[in-house]
Structure formats: structure tokens, C-alpha cells
Amino acid sequence: MLTIEQLNTLIDAGEIDTVIVAFTDMQGRLVGKRISARLFRDEVGQHGAECCNYLLAVDAEMNTVDGYRVSSWEKGYGDMAMIPDLDTLRLVPLDCGHRPGHRRSEVAR
């Protein structure tokens, strides 16, 4: 777990430069956006971000699926709000410790 205060401290120290705002789609994948950490701190963390509701109306290959009331080619694919749940903040392990210009360690397979 990561508190908003801890996140802000890491942002100010330059330890975090990107925040992923995401939700699970109908296949259980995380979808959303990567946002500048400072933009997240100053705006998105309080007010949310927008994304297309298309993300909730596609199959595993990202093809649109008929039958959804909120979105379709006939009704259109509108924007929806992603409101962060700040009680679910986490560090993403694969992104931890990477610095631009520095070599990334190998991942065991």
C-alpha cells in the first residue's frame, strides 16, 4: 500500500514520474492511461481523468462487441470518467528502480 502523502513525497523526490490510472476491462486486463506524476498530484488524483467507454465494449482482440447499452457504433463511443480510488495506490514492481539512461536489469524467465 502507498498513501497519497508517500506518493507526493516520492514525486517531489523525483522517484516517481508517471502514474498509471487504470481499471479492469471485461477480460480482466488493466486498461487506462499513464499520466505525468505531477499532473496526477495536481489534478487527476482529485478530479479524475477521461477515457473512451470503448474500453469496456471490446473483446480480447480489441474488436467491438454488440449488445452494450452504453456504447456501440450506432450510439457512439463516448467519454467516461476514471475516478482514482486513492486507497488502492501501489508501486508497479516492473517500473520500480528504472532510471532513464541507466541499464535495466534482466528479467528472469
Task: Please tell me what each predicted stretch does.
Residues 1-109:
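ATP/Mg2+-dependent ligation/transfer catalytic cores
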